[in-house]
Curated annotation (Swiss-Prot):
N-acetylmethionine sites (modified residues): 1
Alphabetical list of InterPro entries matching this protein: Casein_kinase-1_gamma_C, CK1_Ser-Thr_kinase, Kinase-like_dom_sf, Prot_kinase_dom, Protein_kinase_ATP_BS, Ser/Thr_kinase_AS
Annotated Gene Ontology cellular component terms: cytoplasm
Low complexity bias spans: 19-35
One of the GO BP terms on file: Wnt signaling pathway
GO terms for MF: ATP binding; protein serine kinase activity; protein serine/threonine kinase activity
Catalysed transformations (reactions): L-seryl-[protein] + ATP = O-phospho-L-seryl-[protein] + ADP + H(+); L-threonyl-[protein] + ATP = O-phospho-L-threonyl-[protein] + ADP + H(+)
Reported tissue expression: Expressed in both the striatum and the neocortex.
Ranges of biased composition (kind: Basic and acidic residues): 1-16, 348-358
Organism: Mus musculus (Mouse)
Active site: 162 (proton acceptor)
PROSITE patterns to which the protein is assigned, alphabetical: PROTEIN_KINASE_ATP, PROTEIN_KINASE_DOM, PROTEIN_KINASE_ST
Protein's recorded name: Casein kinase I isoform gamma-3
Length: 424
C-alpha cells in the first residue's frame, strides 16, 4: 500500500507513540513489508469479532506492549461517516472513570480505524448470565455508577442519546477496573452546548427518533430535541428493565416499524410510573418522576439522584463491595478461551426463542440519513466486510482464539436489529 500517497490525503496530526498511548494519525497504513495488516506503527489487525452500528470490529494487538485491543473500522466512502466524530467525542471526554481509552485514530487502507481498549462483557450479556433478572443490590450499584458516568459525559457538553444495556460494559476480567461499569459507543452523541456561542442548543420539535426505542424517553418519542433529562430518563427505564426482567412496552406488534415505535411511545405514556415500579422500592418511582419533570434546559441534580439510591442502599444494609449477581459465574478472560457457563447459552437461547420478534424489532436508531427500511437489518449501516489482501497475514489462529471470547469496548451486535434513520 502506498504510504506516501496516503500522506497527501490528509494533513498530519499526532502519530501514535510506541507506548501505545492515544494518538491521531494520517499515516498510511495497511500491509507492512512483513505482510501483516497494520493500523499505525503499533497495532496489528486480527480477525473480525463483530459489527457495530456503522462498521466492523476487529481484534488487534499492540506490538510494543503485547496488549490486545479493539479496532473499529469504517469505510472512508461511508455515506454518513461518523467514526472521526466519535473519536473527537472520546478525546473531548478524556480519561474519566469508566471511559474507555482510545489509543489511535487513522487510516487503514480504504477504512478509517479507531483503536480502543478491550473491555469485558456488556450488562446485557451479564443479564443473560443471571437468568435475565438482577437483584436490587446489583441494580443500585449499577445505577449509582451510571448516574455519575452520565454526569461526567454531560460535564463535557455532550448528551449520550444511546442508552441500552449493550453499551455499558464491565472492565476486562483480571484488570483492576474489571468491576467498574464503562460507557461506550458515542456514535449517536451530540454537543448540547454550542461550541461557538457556549449556549444550550435550542428546543425543537418534529425531530426524528434517535436512540433505542425500548429505553428512550417519552419526549424523544414525541419528536422533541433531546437534552440531559432524556439520558437520565432512559437510564431509569433501563434500571426497571433489570429489576423487572422486561418492560410493558416490549413485544408490541405492528405492521410497520413506524407504527411499532408509535405503539411503544403510546404505551410508555399510558403506563403510570406507579405501575411500572410496582413492588419495587419507592425510590425507583421517585427517580423517574423527577427526571420526567425536568425542563429541557435544566441541569439535573445528579447529587439528589445519587443520594436517592445510596440512601436506599444503606437502608437495605448493603455493602458497596462490587459483589454483583454475576460474581462467581464463569466469564471470558484475556489469557485463554474459558469454557462458557452453560447457563449463559441456554438462557440466551430460551430468551431469543420466546422474544424473537421483540428483539429483532427493538431497533437501534442509526445516525445515518435515509428512509425507514423494514426488510434490511443492516439498513443505514456501513457493514461491508473488510477482507485482508491474500498476501496479508492476520493474527495467528492460536493467539486470536485466546481473546475471541472477550467482549470489547465497541459494542458489536449479538442480535442484528433493523434500523430507522435520523437527522441530527
Amino acid at each position: 500500500m502506498d504510504n506516501k500517497k496516503k500522506d497527501k490525503d490528509k494533513s498530519d496530526d499526532r502519530m501514535a507513540r510506541p507506548s501505545g498511548r492515544s494518538g491521531h494519525s494520517t499515516r498510511g497504513t495497511g500491509s507492512s513489508s512483513s505482510g501483516v495488516l497494520m493500523v499505525g506503527p503499533n497495532f496489528r489487525v486480527g480477525k473480525k469479532i463483530g459489527c457495530g452500528n456503522f462498521g466492523e470490529l476487529r481484534l488487534g494487538k499492540n506490538l510494543y506492549t503485547n496488549e490486545y485491543v479493539a479496532i473499529k473500522l469504517e469505510p472512508m466512502k461511508s455515506r454518513a461517516p461518523q467514526l472521526h466524530l466519535e473519536y473527537r467525542f472520546y478525546k473531548q471526554l478524556g480519561s474519566g472513570d469508566g471511559i474507555p481509552q482510545v489509543y489511535y485514530f487513522g487510516p487503514c487502507g480504504k477504512y478509517n480505524a479507531m483503536v480502543l481498549e478491550l473491555l469485558g462483557p456488556s450488562l446485557e450479556d451479564l443479564f443473560d448470565l443471571c437468568d435475565r433478572t438482577f437483584s436490587l443490590k446489583t441494580v443500585l450499584m449499577i445505577a449509582i455508577q451510571l448516574i455519575s458516568r452520565m454526569e461526567y459525559v454531560h460535564s463535557k457538553n455532550l448528551i449520550y442519546r444511546d442508552v441500552k444495556p449493550e453499551n455499558f460494559l464491565i472492565g476486562r476480567p483480571g484488570n483492576k477496573a474489571q468491576q467498574v461499569i464503562h460507557i461506550i459507543d458515542f456514535g449517536l452523541a451530540k454537543e448540547y452546548i454550542d461550541p461557538e456561542t457556549k449556549k444550550h442548543i435550542p428546543y425543537r420539535e418534529h425531530k426524528s427518533l434517535t436512540g433505542t426505542a425500548r429505553y428512550m424517553s417519552i419526549n424523544t418519542h414525541l419528536g422533541k430535541e433531546q437534552s440531559r433529562r432524556d439520558d437520565l430518563e432512559a437510564l431509569g427505564h433501563m434500571f426497571m428493565y433489570f429489576l423487572r426482567g422486561s418492560l410493558p412496552w416490549q413485544g408490541l406488534k405492528a405492521d410497520t416499524l413506524k407504527e411499532r415505535y408509535q405503539k411503544i411511545g403510546d404505551t410508555k405514556r399510558a403506563t403510570p410510573i406507579e405501575v411500572l415500579c410496582e413492588n419495587f422500592p419507592e425510590e425507583m418511582a421517585t427517580y423517574l418522576r423527577y427526571v420526567r419533570r425536568l425542563d429541557f434546559f435544566e441541569k439535573p441534580d445528579y447529587d439528589y439522584l445519587r443520594k436517592l439510591f445510596t440512601d436506599l442502599f444503606d437502608r437495605k444494609g448493603y455493602m458497596f463491595d462490587y459483589e454483583y449477581d454475576w460474581i462467581g459465574k464463569q466469564l471470558p478472560t484475556p489469557v485463554g478461551a474459558v469454557q462458557q457457563d452453560p447457563a449463559l447459552s441456554s438462557n440466551r437461547e430460551a430468551h431469543q426463542h420466546r422474544d424473537k420478534i421483540q428483539q429483532s424489532k427493538n431497533q437501534v436508531v442509526s445516525s445515518t440519513n435515509g428512509e425507514l427500511n423494514t426488510d434490511d437489518p443492516t439498513a443505514g449501516r456501513s457493514n461491508a466486510p473488510i477482507t485482508a489482501p491474500t498476501e496479508v497475514e492476520v493474527m495467528d489462529e492460536t493467539n486470536c482464539q485466546k481473546v475471541l471470547n472477550m467482549w470489547c469496548c465497541c459494542f458489536f451486535k449479538r442480535r442484528k436489529r433493523k434500523t430507522i434513520q435520523r437527522h441530527k
